Amino acid sequence: MAALKRKNKKRKYSCLEKKTVRFENPVEKLGRWRRNLRYIYQRVRYGYCDRDIWMMDDWFLSIIPNMLDELNRTRHGFPSALLDKQDMNPDKEANERGDKEWGRILSEMAHCFREANERTCTLKNPYEDEWDNVSWEFYERYGTLGEKLMTEEEIKENKRMHVTTVHLASELPENRELWDKYTEEMKKIDEYQRTCTDQGMELLRKWIRCLWD
C-alpha cells in the first residue's frame, strides 16, 4: 500500500525562489520572501508566475510530463480514433486494445518530454563530475573569471575599454583533452534531447485535442 501511495503521489514544480547563498542578511531574506509571496499570488490568480515565464522551457518540460502521468493514472476512457472506423459497436477486446494503446501513447509522450529536460534526462555525461572538479580547481587557483591569467596587455585594455577579459579552464593545455571529451558527450546528449523534444511535440500535435477526460 505504501508503494502504491508513493507511485500515485503528485510531483510538484515549486514556484518558490530558494536560498542560493550560504548566508543571507535580513534584507536579502525579506526580499526573497516578498518575491515568493508575489509568485504564489500570481500562480493562484493567473495560473503562472514570473519565474515560470523566465524558465518557460523548464516549466513545460517539468509540468507537462507530470500532467500526462496523472491523466494516464486517473483517466476513464480513450479517444475513439483508436478504434476501427468500421467498428460502430466495439466489443470488450477492442475497447481493451484502445485503452492499452492510449495508455502507451500518454506514457511515451511523458517519457519524451521528461528525457528532453536536462534535469530529468537519463542520459548523463560520464565526464561531468571530472570536469566539475577541474573547473573548481581552476576557480580556486585563478579566480572565478580566470583573472589571475590576464596579461598586462589585457589588464590595460580592460581599463581602457571598461570590459573584463574572461579566461576559462578549457584554455589550459592540460585540460584540453578532457574538455574535448566532455563537449563531445554534451553534443550527443543535446542531439538526443532534441530528438526526444521532436518526438514529444509530434505526439502532442497529433493528440492535443484528446488530452481531457
Please identify what each model-predicted range represents.
Residues 2-207:
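Long, non-globular targeting/processing and low-complexity regions
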